[in-house]
Amino acid sequence: MEWDKAKASSGEAVDDRGGGEGGLGYVKVMTDEQMEVLRKQISIYATICEQLVEMHRALTAQQDSIAGMRLGNLYCDPLMVPGGHKITARQRWTPTPMQLQILENIFDQGNGTPSKQKIKDITAELSQHGQISETNVYNWFQNRRARSKRKQAALPNNNAESEAEADEESPTDKKPKSDRPLHQNIAMRDHNSERISEMHHFDTEHEQIRRMMYASNDSSSRSSGSLGQMSFYDNVMSNPRIDHFLGKVESPGSFPHMRSGESFDMY
């Protein structure tokens, strides 16, 4: 009996699925409200996917534009020039001769790295002569300043080396001055020694004469009248060293170190 009921119920289910054309029917899984919610979800997912694609493109373009930023530096700008030309990160910037000349002139006139506004103005001016960005201008001034400091630090070393080379070359420069004949050097040395001995002999004689004159003055002071004075001059003139001394004085070549017009104080 239960079997008959189950068979009857299965027959009713077949009748429910049946109907329509040819007896082929379908089972309605979702209601109309559920279908509408599903359509809305699909539309939202499609919008999200489109937004993700746009975000990916924007991020990729931004990474390409900021690839030249300096890490740890607050000064950063996209590698875009006012003309709209884009310089990729892998492309090395090389200034044109005109750009290099303008940059050198600005560096010589200014003090160090220009301000950010000044860099923008320089970039706008240099963009007329080729591709360039603000980062290129900033980096160029930094590198140029570093090269200038290294060059200034190397100047004292070059001066020291030049002085050392001059000291090394000085003996060779002085050598021709001493390359005189040997007999001339010997003659000059003998002449100098002779002059020294003459001066020493003259000083000795002068000292002896001065002592004699002091002694004669003492003796004449003790004597009386003109007789004492006559005896003093007789003693002086009778000394044979006086004749030798007068001959030395009268001879013009005896004392070449004394110039004309000069006097010699005997007292």
Swiss-Prot record:
Residues 148-195 are annotated as: Disordered. InterPro entries: HD, Homeodomain-like_sf, WOX13-like. Residues 171-195 have a biased composition (Basic and acidic residues). GO terms for cellular component: nucleus. Residues 88-152 bind DNA. Its main location: nucleus. Keywords: Developmental protein, DNA-binding, Homeobox, Nucleus, Transcription, Transcription regulation. It is found in: Nucleus. The keyword DNA-binding applies. One of its GO terms (molecular function) is DNA binding. Belongs to the WUS homeobox family. Transcription factor which may be involved in developmental processes. This is WUSCHEL-related homeobox 8.
